[in-house]
Amino acid sequence: MNDHVIYTQSDVGLNQFFAKIYSLVGMGVGLSAFVSYLMLYPFRENLISILVNQPMIYYGAAIIELILVFVASGAARKNTPAALPIFLIYSALNGFTLSFIIVAYAQTTVFQAFLSSAAVFFAMSIIGVKTKRDMSGLRKAMFAALIGVVVASLINLFIGSGMMSYVISVISVLIFSGLIASDNQMIKRVYQATNGQVGDGWAVAMALSLYLDFINLFISLLRIFGRND
């Protein structure tokens, strides 16, 4: 009887922790979507002007964005109060840079990619939480494959192969789908291993990881669905 009560309390605590992380992911994605919307519609002329006349603004934002990822991750793992604000600032800036990618695609393609990303995220999250198979090995393999994708993408910047870009996007979908599942399993295992004694900073760190999984999955699907746009 007591074991059942402890198990039930543990389940409730785990569900609450997942809810906290998913709410942070939702905040990040929502903020990115809002900023992208502003750039794509009310400030569309400014976006086009930057693309044509001041592309260095985009590249500068992308560099700052990369720095913020490491700063946010470091702050989160140290459990500092600054972790959440930095994550939200990063999400807003990412919405700005995403708008320069999204502007090249039809609205229906963007919605299709977003809804597909949400469906894959939901499905892989369930798999990650429910599966009893250890996914730590898969996680390492996905990160190794991700390095390969980055290298291939850099090479393709000079080659400009449409087919290579398509293959990279398909592989990226598989990689980030796997990372979504493994990240969710890691959240569950760390929570259980620490008996629920995990700080808010770690919740932000995992929210950032899942946010990046979702955004990169979305970009990959956008490129696949928008090949003819």
Swiss-Prot record:
InterPro entries attached to this UniProt entry: Bax_inhibitor_1-related
Designated name of the protein: Uncharacterized membrane protein M6_Spy0327
GO cellular component: plasma membrane
Record field: transmembrane: 21-41, 56-76, 83-103, 109-129, 141-161, 162-182, 202-222
Species this chain originates from: Streptococcus pyogenes serotype M6 (strain ATCC BAA-946 / MGAS10394)
Keyword Membrane: yes
PANTHER family with a match to the protein in the record: BAX INHIBITOR-RELATED, PROTEIN LIFEGUARD 4
Family matches, as Pfam families: Bax1-I
Family in the record: Belongs to the BI1 family.
Keywords from the UniProt entry: Cell membrane, Membrane, Transmembrane, Transmembrane helix
Topological category with respect to the lipid bilayer: Multi-pass membrane protein
Subcellular location as annotated: Cell membrane
Cell membrane listed as a keyword: yes
